[in-house]
A protein has these predicted regions:
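FAD-binding subdomain of flavoenzyme oxidoreductases
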Residues: 1-110
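Short hydrophobic alpha-helical segments that form membrane-spanning helices or hydrophobic packing faces
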Residues: 10, 65-67, 219-220, 307, ...
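A short, flexible low-complexity segment enriched in Lys/Arg and Gly/Pro that occurs
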Residues: 25-44, 269-280, 304-313
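Acidic/polar loop patches that form or flank catalytic/metal-binding clefts of enzymes
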Residues: 36-37, 106-108, 158-161, 297, ...
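C-terminal substrate-recognition/cap domain of FAD-linked oxidoreductases
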Residues: 73, 79-87, 92-284, 288, ...
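Small/polar glycine-rich anion-binding or flexible loop at a beta-alpha turn
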Residues: 115, 254, 296, 301-308
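Activity-critical C-terminal alpha-helical subdomain
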Residues: 303-343
Length: 343
């Protein structure tokens, strides 16, 4: 929990209150100059929030030792559907945007492009897949799913499977077969396969960001193009055809005003040069994210890997202000040197 707060990360809910910011009621931290303790309140408009300053500080300002959190009851009712679309970008700016702006409160609203669907065995690679889901601790959510599906169908979507689960029966009402469960299994396994992939000669890297809807299509196209070109150059392969790098995208979180695209790179590694290859790819794609107007990270935090592009993203006055806070709380620079502020 402390790590989630310190990295200001996002949860698995695709819409609504998913970032840890929304769930923290108060924070206690220890700094080299003393204790940091905010007042426990359900809400406050009293100036800048002390909690928000510590949330996302990544250990550079203090060590979080306690926190009061807003929790939800475990859901009893669930309803899910897998919906196919002919084209990823059009589905994003059409169906997914409309669902987000309808504010239905979907717990899952992940759009997966055809290549990722095929790679994870969630689909055959001919369709983009929207994994749509709702859940509640109090009441059935089938009606919400129906509304979401209706919006998707208005934008060209075709339902491939659906399921409604309630406390009275375990299996629920299930129709058709879809790729939601297959994708989920691959998603949960992916972080543990990274080292295995490299040992087998495959580079694996991800880039996650966020962008407003009005810029999404151009942004997505530019990042995909940059990634294909750079990865092909670095790995010494053709950007197209057999042996080409696999660059895919999905939307992990969606908002009424934008989305969080998540890009995945799979490419042949050069034995002994894997780190250098990774550095070149990381730098080029990160540059494309910032130049396109996106954020360097939506929910993976800054750390040291993203620091050069975080410096470009934030306002200079904010950087100086954050440095002043660091100097006040950690004058000797003991806490996580080089993260967020300082050399």
């Amino acid at each position: 929990l402390g790590g989630w707060i310190a990295t200001r990360a996002g949860g698995h809910f695709a819409t609504g209150e998913t970032h840890i910011d929304d769930l923290v009621e108060s924070v206690r931290a220890l700094t080299p100059t003393g204790e940091w303790q905010s007042r426990r309140l359900p809400g406050s408009g009293a100036g800048p929030s002390p909690d928000r300053l510590m949330i996302g500080s990544e250990g550079a300002l203090g060590v979080i030792t306690e926190a009061w959190m807003r929790v939800r009851p475990r859901p009893k009712y669930k309803a899910t559907a897998t919906i196919g679309f002919d084209e990823f970008s059009a589905a994003a700016t059409g169906a997914v945007r409309a669902i987000a702006q309808a504010r239905l409160g979907a717990s899952n609203c992940r759009l997966i492009d055809p290549l990722e669907a095929k790679t994870t065995m969630a689909g055959d690679g001919t369709k983009a897949l929207l994994l749509l889901g709702f859940e509640s601790a109090d009441c059935p959510v089938g009606t919400l799913l129906d509304q979401g599906v209706r919006i998707a169908e208005q934008h060209g979507g075709k339902v491939l499977s659906s399921r409604v689960s309630e406390p009275d029966f375990e299996a629920g009402d299930k129709k058709g077969t879809g790729g939601g469960s297959q994708w989920k299994d691959s998603f949960l396994l992916a972080p543990y396969l990274r080292d295995t992939f490299v040992a087998c000669g495959v580079l694996s890297e991800t880039f996650e960001t966020a962008i407003t809807w009005d810029r999404f299509e151009e942004f997505h196209a530019d990042v995909m193009s940059t990634a294909r070109r750079v990865v092909a150059e670095v790995c010494g392969v053709s950007p197209d055809g057999e042996g080409a790098p696999r660059i895919s995208c999905r939307l992990t979180h969606v908002y009424p005003d934008g989305a969080a695209p998540y890009f995945t790179v799979l490419a042949p590694a050069r034995r002994g040069g894997e780190v250098e290859q990774w550095d070149e790819i990381k730098a080029a794609v990160s540059e494309a994210l910032i130049e396109g107007g996106g954020t360097i990270t939506h929910h993976h935090a800054v750390g040291r890997d993203h620091r050069p592009w975080y410096d470009l993203q934030r306002p200079d006055a904010f950087a100086r202000s954050l440095g002043a806070v660091k100097a006040e709380l950690d004058p000797a620079g003991l806490l996580n040197p080089g993260v967020l502020v300082g050399p």
